[in-house]
Structure formats: structure tokens, C-alpha cells
Amino acid sequence: MAGGGGVGGGAGEHAAAAYWYDACEDGASLLCGIDFAASADFDPGLIPAMDTGADDGFVAEIDRILESINAESSPAPPPPPPPPLPEPVPVAPPELPIQEKQLQVASAPVANNAVAVVGVVQRSKGVVARKEPRRESHGCAANGGGGGEWRDGKRPRLASGGVGGPRQEWRRRPMLPPPPSRGWDDRRGRRDFDRVRKHEHHRREARGFWERDRGGKMVFRSGTWEQESDREAKRARTQDGGSMEKKAEADRMGAAQREKPVAEERARQYQLEVLEQAKSRNTIAFLETGAGKTLIAVLLIKSVCDKMLKENKKMLAVFLVPKVPLVYQVLVMTAQILLNILRHSIIKMDAIHLLILDECHHAVKKHPYSLVMSEFYHTTPKEKRPAVFGMTASPVNLKGVTSQEDCAIKIRNLESKLDSVVCTIKDRKELEKHVPMPLEVVVQYDKAATLWSLHEQIKQMESTVEEAALSSSKRTKWQFMGARDAGSRDELRLVYGVSERTESDGAANLIQKLRAINYALGELGQWCAYKVAQSFLTALQNDERANYQVDVKFQESYLKKVVDLLHCQLTEGAAMKSETSDVEMQNTEKHNTNDLEEGELPDSHGEHVDEVIGAAVADGKVTPRVQALIKILLKYQHTEDFRAIIFVERVVTALVLPKVLAELPSLSFIRCASLIGHNNNQEMRACQMQDTISKFRDGRVTLLVATSVAEEGLDIRQCNVVIRFDLAKTVLAYIQSRGRARKPGSDYILMLERGNISHETFLRNARNSEETLRKEAMERTDLSHLDGTSVLSPVDTSPGSMYQVESTGAVVSLNSAVGLIHFYCSQLPSDRYSILHPEFIMQKYEKPGGSVEYSCKLQLPCNAPFEKLEGPICSSIRLAQQAVCLAACKKLHEMGAFTDTLLPDRGSGEGEKTEQNDEGEPLPGTARHREFYPEGVADILRGEWILSGRDGYQNSQFIKLYMYSVNCVNVGTSKDPFVTQLSNFAIIFGNELDAEVLSTTMDLFVARTMITKASLVFRGRIEITESQLVLLKSFHVRLMSIVLDVDVDPSTTPWDPAKAYLFVPVGAEKCTDPLREIDWTLVNNIVNTDAWNNPLQRARPDVYLGTNERTLGGDRREYGFGKLRHGTAFGQKAHPTYGIRGAIAEFDIVKASGLVPARDRGHFSDYQNQGKLFMADSCWNAKDLAGMVVTAAHSGKRFYVDCICYNMNAENSFPRKEGYLGPLEYSSYADYYKQKYGVELIYRKQPLIRARGVSYCKNLLSPRFEHSDAREGDFSENLDKTYYVYLPPELCLVHPLPGSLVRGAQRLPSIMRRVESMLLAVQLKDIIDYPVPATKILEALTAASCQETLCYERAELLGDAYLKWVVSRFLFLKYPQKHEGQLTRMRQQMVSNMVLYQYALNKTLQSYIQADRFAPSRWAAPGVLPVFDEESREYEPSIFDEESTGCELQKESYDDYADNMQEDGEIEGDSSCYRVLSSKTLADVVEALIGVYYVAGGKIAANHLMKWIGIHAELDPEEIPPPKPYDIPESIMRSINFDTLKGVLGIEFQNKGLLVEAITHASRPSSGVSCYQRLEFVGDAVLDHLITRHLFFTYTDLPPGRLTDLRAAAVNNENFARVAVKHKLHVHLRHGSSALETQIREFVKDVQEELLKPGFNSFGLGDCKAPKVLGDIVESIAGAIFLDSGYDTSVVWKVFQPLLHPMVTPETLPMHPVRELQERCQQQAEGLEYKASRAGNIATVEVFVDGVQIGVAQNPQKKMAQKLAARNALVVLKEKETATKKEDERDGEKKNGAQMFTRQTLNDICLRRQWPMPQYRCVNEGGPAHAKRFVYSVRVNTSDRGWTDECIGEPMPSVKKAKDSAAVLLLELLNRDFPDKPDGKQP
């Protein structure tokens, strides 16, 4: 945020934060630890939000001190903790049995004294046992069948307890008894062979493995891949800086050292003496620097705290410090922070119990200490005032005292101000023991000769710059002098801490630099002045902000002249002569610092220095003072542990002296650095200051050149030398700087100019004043002698001196008004081209008698509520400024620009405020914030009639119901007869459905080449008896139990009246009586059959089929993983648990043959001759089986019977697997069933049944077929291969439901899903009460996660734009005085997702939303409970992830993963009545509803919906304010070419003031014209709405994603900026920034080059970053047209449609290079990574794909550099793809031949040589989700030579590629090891 300049200088970029501290970076943290609850008036929300950071070091230090104090009363200190033992190396314990493992986990000990610390994760540090990962076989064929793989790291599934259940330990699953033999004569022998092979596998593994080195060559490595990987990782860690174990050990030792108690620091006697007095009364502790005043304050806090705790009261203690650096040592806040808090009434003075003031001598004049006491402490009743404790090294902060009486008066003033008594110690022996006094030495130097010529030339430059500044601006002499000398700059920094941006005024900044150079020239010499000028010039050239400042070139040209003028060199040749150096060093050792008492250096050193720089002193290159300093420093070149501080007055001296001293070889023993504070132009950051102090402490720096910042507060190491290069200005500075020399035997050297009377007088007064102050303090024991002598000046509380808000108590006074106005200007919206600040225009009035008075006119920036205000006539310039600023503050508060706390209003007047969530929880309105909501059911479906027929329910009357038939029309054709052979159904409801529901046609995606359009047709009203209803209900339950696979009993199933309807079968013929259309015969047969007694007929058992083939029927996806619903997986030789889905298992673990009923061979020949077949439970006529459903007794699967194959029986050979060339596994079908299921077929001569599996009920509303244009000719071939299976009749049970009935019923759940959704939409439509089609409302309620043909995303896009426009228009018109920043924040609070989410909850929209993909298994049909979908979503982390160290941590990681991965609608339990919705979904639905209402009914309908939802954004006509009058100067009107603008826009403005405002930038000096920011605010919303509407209605079939891309390409600042350049709107821009002019010129040049390219239009994706201002003026012109046309958006579109031409289209839509590269890498499964770095003003971005750099780009903007780098990477990848394609074309024949090495090639070799299939193993899996990498190994058993060596492939982005890489390596190994070709062919 830019700041203000004006009289008081500019406000800084971080003015908002700086307001709360004096140039401090972590201001808000200063309030941490304060119990604001002690004040009932405190409102924490009033403190502005900012980044905070607590000073943990200080808190730890206080704890340590208090512990040491408490230790005095304890019997004996606790022994120090033993040093930590080295962490033992993890050792894997032996594998425990399952029961022992579980017991071990359950009985983990918990420490009794464990303490739970919030925010701290406690980890156990015991021995961590490594668990051996389980290896699980997946389909490994016994005879080389299908191959297989060994893959480590697969964790077991969760137990049946679900998410919250315990995890299973890592162990091998207990194997169940094996089935009968299946092809080998000796199965036990086969297992022994496998065991031997595994042993050989591991033996070979221990030998080594093959892999490729970096050059691509095959290399053999010993051991395993994991061991080699660990060795490489350790080598890499060692190269990076040592062993990680050593580093960890060092960290542990360091932590132990830190935790070890330091030597006890006990309070000294004199500290306790002062403490006792402070406990009884307000006290000012007068003690030397280093005497431990802070400890006394801490002890006082502890004492008061203990007292308040005993009284059960809350305490608020405030520790104040005068400067920011002190905060980092002694807490809590600077005085300015407390002053601001009190002034803005955030807390009250009576809420503070203890007030501690460090360095309290600053409480004079207008210092914050003084203002806190005078404005708030003394105005508070005495009984409510806090206790005060002040600390100082000198109660008088002046040049000294003249007498004992003068000293007493000054101390009285301080005591009165602080309402305290000065206290010091009388016995100084203990103090002198701990704080030794240094030896004070005076060194005199000669006065410097003045270089008049150079001085005059620099002064002349200063005068020239000042005159140029005056001539370039239209300000008066008084105005400029006021800006420079009125003193407001100091007040601004002191009061509000707003960093002054003097660069904003290039002339004033340059004058300051020239004055600093001139000072260095006179005080330090020409050489030093040259160094200063050179530093200024270098800093200016390297400053990143220099590109955006107005007068940079102007400053640079003058500084170059000064550098050339002062250029000189300084040599030190004489000092390096060896013949003199040795002698001088020896002589130096003979002297000590005692020789300096007389103020003269030994002659030998004087001669030596004269040889070194004597000529330079004579020439004026170095002054005698610098020469004397060098002499002093040379005296200490052999001093052991030398530490020194040189105190200087000016910052320029502190900056240049280290450079001077560093260039003198004779002072090479010194390592010098600067230490400056914050209150200067060359600010030193706090982190840099602490770093310098740290270096000084550990010896990397031995000499500090410091300003007054080092005099007090900072924790600087004890020094043995302190040099006052510039004499102190006050007694306090004299005492405090001396206190830095606390080391025994140290020297305090004062440098005095020879013959300077003022220097000698000050030194004499300082010495006398110190003694006088100490004497006076000892005599002051109470305040009784002060009665009637108080000199405290009363606070000016006259009405004109302050302004107070009655409601809050906030106050602004003359002292704070100027700073508050500057702070307000810094908070106004601005950019880097405009630095907003107030301007003061002074008017002088001369009165008779020679007196002068002044008045001040205040001019605020152009985007303030008012621009000019004239103040009253006052006696001084400063008072005139204060008076006008105070009046401005009052006016701003009355206009609403200030809140009631007198802080700038940020725009919180409209909408709901942001709610604060607990830490770590996602905020409402975000996608991650999810909650459970009940599923909505339409009220029309409710019916008590569904409860008829229950026990005890008597009703003899007819029940009146409504019947609707399901009408299905097929679109397209299909050769599959099962798709079209369906039964007809009707649905019975208790209420009549809405006509819109009947008119709705839903698409059911039943086949790849056919879609069924279903709808409901009203058949009529029916009346049925209770007995008929019971029969229909039983049929409904039986039907749905089969469709949904739920085992329920019609007599016991519960019915819910909230959802009352029934499915009934109907005949094909229509009848006049709809009741007769029901197929009652079918209903009776199905309900009354005895077949339901067999559990296999009621629901499908969950069994493992032992294969992944779909030829056995059923759903491959469901059974392919061999996992049952209870989390149990089985191998090939295991038997499953037969569990009824949706119910409790009724069978134990048994052989499959146990379910097959007993059969008899007796009458087989007779029945065969009669055309009957022996089924599992009865005999059936073969002709009657066609179309029926049969249940396989051996597996529990159900099948549709297609036909009877009389030419096949069970003795036919079993078909070979596709692609398998090995020996036959099963000789016949009978052999297959015997080996596979243990079933011995009896009727082997019976013909087989050709059947197709009955699939689960599917979601037919979602398009399931990607390729709808598949060739119909391919269907029959795929059908035969995929779906048909041949079953022996004796293993089949005939199901009571016909096949056509089941297939027809499987469509009913999808149909009712859409019907129920439509009923909810109709219900919501009736509630909203506006005629909009219910189908449109349903579209707005359906999320994309449903994966249906309906989706709200397009409507949401339109509704979002319309909502933004309506709210923007409302705010713009309602608040004409608020600026653009306030309006933007208010709009955000009205349209944010969090607010819309609350609106949705208020209207219970969560009950109407369809957000989950329809799953029939979870659908709640009437009378049938839903079941949980068995697809597991468990989290299976890789073994290469970090192992968790406890059960709690494992559960937490799973929960986090589930939260992140869960989508809308997904639930974690068995429930269909609740679903999970993100709060963002609810907010999106609100916008989508606005969109559909706008489409259906325009603005009126959309506004009606917004009003219903709770968004009030309409103004009554009488509330709309009249147009703002414009009084634009004639000179401005003449400067604008209105005719040209009329030609470009095609419209003439009625109010030309709007157009002038639309093209005026904030950098333009205010002259009665506002800037365009408010017009840009409303214009941005208008254009966004109009362009979005155009795209929405133009491209009606465009998917939401593409429509969003079109909108983003059309509505962006880059595109608008190019529109401005294309139509030359930029030439009319009124601004006052040369930097902006340069950027516009460069951008125009680039755009003109782009436009020359044929057909080129980047739509904002060009290579040149556009200045935001250009896009802003396009939006502001749109806003001006909108207002000038009477708020008519059609006029705006009429103007801008040709301006925006050519509009982006789907064909011309450019994809952002970053997105294009991201999508390409995702499609190719390649890892993408960006690495960014910055060097100066240039950002560099590198692009890596799979770890290889393929693109790089540089640009000042990081985003632009990323875009260019992505574009370069795409070019490289496309060129690479083209080259690869050409190479493939050239070598196509070779690649298509036998030499193309893949896994298939390796499999073919194994088949031909009759080897077992290759064994693959995953050896590594890691990396982030977007850059996953897999490493696989492979080996093969060659039978004759045993196992091959393991071959490790390269890291690949997919498992397939990783296996291929390993296979290629193994093929190369086989080619090398076998003399003949591996494929079996002889060479």
C-alpha cells in the first residue's frame, strides 16, 4: 500500500501495519500474553489483522529467572538431568504370534505424569521395531498360467469395524484347508517344489542384481537394491554436509545443553531493596546500565500476579519500551502501541493493573510516554489507575543540571509526570562489584580544515535541486518549506510509525543525500565523502523500486556529478614497510591504556600514523578526527578478546566508517560492522540488527560503529573499549554509552576537539550532573515535599483541542491528528505509480506589531470523500497543521470514512462478518468444509396408506391411489436381445404428481448403441383393498430385494410413510380400468412360491470365484480383487465365507460342494428322453428354461438362460484361456468343477446351459459408454467372448423371477431417482413462488459429481457474474462517499461463498441438492433398507512412506486422508438418509439458481430469487442519489480530445465529467477531478456480466469447463489492456507518473508487433505483461457509459461489442501454456516440476519433466517467467515427439518384429521354453501424487539353470512402464547368457 508524503513525508507501503508499531515488523505479537478479558470494554476484533510472531526467547528467559528466584526458598535444587543417551539403532524384533502382537499393542504403558500440551505432538523415542512387509500373491499360476507378481507394501484392509476399527497387524493371512487336487498328481510335492524355488529366489537375491548405470550400461551390484539405495542415500547425505546420524546426535546434545540449568542467577540485594519499595508505591528505579532493572520489573510482575491470583482477580500488566529494538529483549509493546490502543479505545487505562516503563526518562514533551500519562493516566480516577514502575539510568534526559535545585526541579517534573518517586541505592559497593566503572580517557584532535571549494559546489547543487523542485510544482515557497522544515515528518514517524517514502519526492530525497555528503566532507574528509556518494549512487542503481519512481534519472545524474567531483584515492604504502612495522609493534606492547589519561598518544604511534595517512590529512582527504580514531584503534591491536563500540551521531558516519577502516591494511585485525536503528532513512531491519549483534557476540565482528540505538536496551556483549567519536548530546547518552564498557579494566574514550569550549563545558557538566543526580535521588524518599509544587502541566481538554466519540470513547487530539490523516491517506486504494499523501498549503498573515499568524489548507487525495479543507488561523505553522487535521478527522468520521474507533473504515458495513473457526478447521464456504445433511424427500411422496396391512392396523375401506405406467422408448438399435426383452411396470403413488414431472423425459444409457427415453404416463385413479395392497407390497419387496441384493422378509420389513410408492407389473395391453392392467397372476405366483425358502434365491452371496475372468458370469470389478465385504481375501486354494449381502451370514466356512443338494442317477435316462433336465432342486422342461434366471449352487451367482446347447456336455474339453499357449489346465468341464469347486458332476451327459451373468443394478442416468459410435458389427464378437458361460444344469436352481422382469426392474431405481429429484425441484419452485420450469431448477440443484447429463456449472457461471454486477451496482449507488477499496470489501462480504452458504442453510437448500453419483446399492427403496457399497476407499500408503509410531498417529493420518479425498455425497457408513456436502457446493447452488432464474425470466426473475434467498441488493427509485455534479476546470476540459473519444466509442457523453473521471489516474495531482477507481469498480462488474451473458447464450452446448475458459480469456485485465492499445485509449489517460509512461510505451510497442502478425490474438496470453492501468481505464469507461446512459446495460454492450471484436471463440481460445503443459504431463504420466529463483529484478523459472530440465525463461514478473518457460518446454516436447514419430516410421518394421522387447516378448519366450512366468516385484514406490515413480524388478526360473539374477528397471511414472523397463533389462541378460536366442530360435 502506498503511503503519503506532503508536509510530513509519505506514508510507507506497509503503513497499515506500521500504524501499530514504530517501524516494527511484528506489531500484533506485542499484544500476545495480555489478558484483555480483564477489561469489559475491550474488543479484540478492533485490532487490524496482520502477521504476528511471538518472542519465545523472552518468555523462556523470564521463566528461567523466576525458576532461579523460586529456587532460593526450596531445600535443594534438583540435580541436573543426565545427558541424553544416543538413540539406539532400530532392531527388528522376532515375529510375534498374532495374539501376542495385539496384546503388546493393547498394553502399551502410559506415563502417569504425562502432560497434554496443546499444539504439541508427542512422539515416543523408544526402539522402533521394523515390521516385515507382507508379500501377497496375486493370481500366480501353478503351471505358468497367468504369471504374477510379488509386490511389497500392501497393507491389509480394515477390519469389519470400519473406519474406526482397529487395524490388523502385518502378518500372513492364515490359510484355510486346501481343496482337492487340481491337476498335479502330488499337490504336496508341488508345494515342496515351490518352497525350494522360493529358497533359491532368496538365495539369488542375496547374491546381487542387475541394473543400468547413468550411461545406460548394464551393471551387476552385490546385495539387494534396497541396500544399495540406502548406501547411495547415506553417501549423498555425507556429501551435503556430514552424516545425518552425527547431525542428529549434535542436535540432541544441543537440546540437552539448552535444557541444562544455567548457573543460578539470584537477585542481588540492591535489586530486592528497590523491589520492596516498588511493591508499596509507584517507583522510578534510578540505576546504571547493566544493573539489572529488567529483573526487578519481572519480580514485580510476579509479585502483583501472585496477589491478584489470591484475590481471584484477572490481571493486565503492560511493559512499555521506548524503541522497537527493546521489544525483542524485554517484551511487550512500545509506548506508541499502547497510546494508539488507548486513543482508539480498544482497551481502557482502568483495565491495566501494572504499567512498567523502561527508560522512563523519555517521558518529556510529546513523547508517547508523556502522552500516555497525560492523556490517559492522569485523567483516570486515582482508585482506577495502574501501579507504575519506571526504570532509567538517568532521570534527566538533557544536557545536564546547573545546580542541586535545578536537578530537584527536573526530577520533580519526571516524578509528577509518572506519579512516582525516584529511588536509587545508597550502598553502591555491591553495585560496583557487579557493574564496574570503566576508565574514562579524553583524546583531543585538531580542528579539520574546510574544503571551501567542494563545499560550495555541493551546496550550489542543493540550491539548484530546490529551485527545480519549486519550479516543477505549482506549490508556493511556504508549502515547500513546510514540507521540509515544519516538523511534521518527525511527528509522523513518532506518532504513527508510518515509514516515510522520501523517494516519492525525488528533490527532497536528493537534498537529504547532498546534505549527508556535505556533512561527511566536513567531518570525515573528502575520501569518506566520496565513499558516501558512491554508496548512494550504487544503492539507487540497484534499488528494485527505482523503475517505478518519478525522479530516478534526475537523482542519478546529480549523484554522478558528485562522485566525479569527490573522486580520490587513499593509499597506505608506508604502513606496510617491514622495517618499520616490526619495531612499531614491539613498541606498542610496552604501552597500556593508562598512558591515554592525559589525552595524548605515544609519539611512536603518532609517527607511524603520520606515515600512513599524514599526507591524506594534509590534503583534506581525511580529517584529524579520523586520524585520531585510527591512532586509538592501533593501540589495541594486540589486546586479547578485543571488543569495541564507536558511538557516532549521524547514520552516514556509521555507514561509512566501517568501509574506511576496512580499506586500511594496518587495521586488518579489526572486523567492523554498522549498527543503526529504525528512525532514519537508511533503516536497518530488526533481523539484520540482531544478526550484527550475534556476530559481535561470537567474535565474527569485533568493532561496532553504532548510533544511539546501541546506548540502551540492546543485549550487547560487554566491551573493553567504548569510543565516543561524536560527543554525547545529553547526560543520559553520556551515562548509557559509558555503561557499555562493563568489562573489568575497560576504557571509555571521549574524543574532544582541541580548543572547543562547548565540548569541554559539556563534559564538565555531565560529570557534575551525574553526581548531583545521584545525590538528589538518595535524598528523595517520599513525595511529601512536593505538596503544592507540582509542575505537571494540565492536559488541554478544550473543545477545539480534541474530538471524542461518545459511543466508544475513542479520541483524536491535536497531537495525533496529523499522523492519523497520513495513516488514512496510506489506506486509500493506490498502486505503485501513485503514492497518496495529504498536502498542506500554508498561508501567512502579518499583524501590526510584527507578529505572524498562519492558516493551513489541507488537500486530500482525489479518492478521498472530500478533497479540500481550510483550517483556522493559528499562532504557528505546526499548530495550523494540527488544527486542520483535527477538523478533517472529525469530518471524515461524520462522513463514515472513520469507524467509531477513529480508524479508517475498510468496508465492513454490509453483509455478514466472517466467522472465526477453530484453528486447523476449514472455513465455511470452502470446498474442504464438509458436513452431514439429511437427504430430502418430497412432501408429495408421503403417505400413511403404505402402513396398511400391519399387525393391528384395521381399515375396511378402499384405498384410493394413483397409478402411473413407465413408458420406455428406445432410440437406436441393439442386437442384444436382453436389452429389449423387458417386462412392463407401473408405479403407484398416494398423491397425484405434478404435470411437469410427467412431461419430463429421462435418458437411460442402457447400451453402447441405444438410449432409452423413459417417462411416466398417468393411467388413472385406482381403488384397492387392504389384502390387495399387502400382496402388492410383498411383490415389491421380493422384486427390490433381488434388484438391490438385500435379503429381506416382506412380513417383517419396516415401511416409512415419508416415501410411499410401489412397483407393480403390468401387461402390455391397455385397459380402461387401470387396476386390471396389473398382472395379478404373476404377482401371486411370485409372492406365494416356496423357492424363497432357499437363501441363495433371496440374495446373492459374496463369494470368491477364483479368477478374474468375466466368462464365469457376474461383475469382474466386484470380484476381481478377491475381497469380501468383511475385509477377508482368499487365495486360490482357500474357501470363502458365504455371506448374504445386506444381512448376517447364514453359512459357516464350508466347501462349495456342501451347498449342492444330493442328486440321484436313477431316472436320468427316462427324463432325458422326455426332454427334461435335472436341475439342482428339481427337473425342468428344457424348452421352459429359455429366458429364466438360474442360480449357480456352487457359487451363488445368478445367470440369464440364453439357450440349451445340446451339442455340448460336461465331458467336452475345457476351453483354453485366451493367449495361453501352455498345457491344458483342465481336461473337461467336469474336471474343472471337480478341481475348482470340489463338485463331482453326476449327469455329465446332460446338455450344458448357455447363460449370461446377471449384473448388479447400475446407474443408468450417467453416460457409461465413452464410444457411442462403436461399430455394430463388433458387438456379437465381443458378446460371445465376454458374457456367455456354459453351466451344467445339475448345479443350477431356477429362480422364481423371470429374466425379463428382473431386467425391467433394474431400470426402476434410476427412473425413480430422477422422479424424486424432479418432485423436489417442483416443491422448491412452489416455495420460491415464481414461474420457472422445474427442469431448470433441477439443473441448478444437480452437481457435476452426479455425473449426469444435468449440471449446475454453466448456470453458476452466469449467476456469479449477474450477482456480482447487481451487488456492485447497489453498493456504488448506495454509498457515493466510499472509495473503491471499501466497496470491494463490502461486495466480497455480500457475495462470498461463506455468506451464500449461510443463505442456503437458512432456506434448507441442502435438502434439495443432488450432489452424489447415484448408486442403486445405497438407494433407499420403500420397504427395502439400503446396503453399503462394497467398494473400499481405504487408505493404503506405500511402504516407502514414513512409518507411523503409534496407533493414534495411524488413525489420524487415515482421517486426514479421508477428509481430503472425500467428495460430495460420499459417506463413510451404511446410510442413505445422510450425505456429505461441502459448503462451497451450497454456495454454488445459490449462484446457479440465480443463473437459471435469469435465463428463464430475466432480471425480474433473478432479482425475485435473490430477494427470496436473502440478498437485498435493490434500491427504490427514490433512494438512488442524483448524479454527482462535476465542476471541472476549463483548462482540463480543453486538454481532452472529446471528439476523438467520441469517434472511438461511438457515443457522446451527456455528462462529460464522467468521461474525464474515467480517464484520470490517481497519480494525477488533484484538481477537482476524482480518479477512475469507483467507475472501474462498477465497470468491471458490468463488463463481466455482459461478456458472460454473451458467451452463455451464444455457445449453448459448450461444456462448463470450456465456457469458463472462454470467460477467463475474454474477461481479464491483459485482454482489456490490449483493447485499450488497439483503439488508442491509452493516449487519453491522464496520469502523473513517468514510470507508468515508460511501461505503457514499452507495452504499446509489443502489442503493435503482435497485431502485425496475421490472425494473431493472444486474448491476454501475450509475452508482455500489461500495465494494470490500461485494463482499468477500459472498465472505468464502461462504468461511465453505464452511469451516463441512466444505468442501461444495453448501451454499454452496444459500445463495447465492436471494441472487444474479435471476441474469443472455442476455435480461437488459446490455452495457457502452464495449463497445457500440466494436462499433457498428466496424460503422459510424466512428473512436472517448476523451480523458481530470483536474482535482483529478474525471476528465473525452470521446467523439469521427469527430473530433466526442458525449459527455462527469465522475466521481471515470476508469473510471466513461468508462462514463458512452460511455452519453451512445450516447444521442446513437441519437437521431441515429432522426431520420435519420424524415427518410429523409419524403424516401424523392426519395432513390429520379434526384436521389440516388451513383457509380452518375455512371456512368449517363457512359454516356448516351458519356463514359469516371470516374477515381478515392486521395489520402490514414492514421490508426490503428481510425480509418482515406480521401480520394479523381474526374474525368471530357467528350470535348467535355476533363477536368473534380479533385474531392476528404471523409475517410471506407471507400473506398466516400470515392468517393461525391468523386462527389457532381463531380455538383454538372457541374450547374453544363452548361446542360442532366448526365443528358442537357433542363431
Swiss-Prot record:
It holds the Pfam family DND1_DSRM. Its main location: nucleus. Residues 629-789 form the Helicase C-terminal domain. Residues 1320-1498, 1538-1686 form the RNase III domain. GO terms for molecular function: ATP binding; helicase activity; metal ion binding; ribonuclease III activity; RNA binding. Disruption phenotype: Severe dwarfism and dark green color. Seedling viability compromised. The record marks K1668 as: Important for activity. Residues 75-96 have a biased composition (Pro residues). Its EC number is 3.1.26.-. Coiled coil: none annotated. A motif (DECH box) lies at residues 358-361. GO terms for biological process: miRNA processing; siRNA processing. Residues 71-97, 129-188, 221-262, 577-604, 901-928 are annotated as: Disordered. It is found in: Nucleus. Residues 1712-1775, 1797-1872 form the DRBM domain. Keywords: ATP-binding, Endonuclease, Helicase, Hydrolase, Magnesium, Manganese, Metal-binding, Nuclease, Nucleotide-binding, Nucleus, Repeat, RNA-binding, RNA-mediated gene silencing. Residues 274-413 form the Helicase ATP-binding domain. Gene3D superfamilies: 3.30.160.20, Dicer dimerisation domain, P-loop containing nucleotide triphosphate hydrolases, paz domain, Ribonuclease III domain. One of its GO terms (cellular component) is nucleus. The keyword Ribosomal protein does not apply. It comes from the Eukaryota. Residues 129-138, 228-262, 907-916 have a biased composition (Basic and acidic residues). Involved in the RNA silencing pathway. Cleaves double-stranded RNA to produce microRNAs (miRNAs) of 21-24 nucleotides which target the selective destruction of complementary RNAs. Regulates by this way the development of the plant. May not be involved in small interfering RNAs (siRNAs) production. May interact with ARGONAUTE1 or PINHEAD through their common PAZ domains. Belongs to the helicase family. Dicer subfamily. This is Endoribonuclease Dicer homolog 1. It comes from Oryza sativa subsp. japonica. The gene is DCL1.
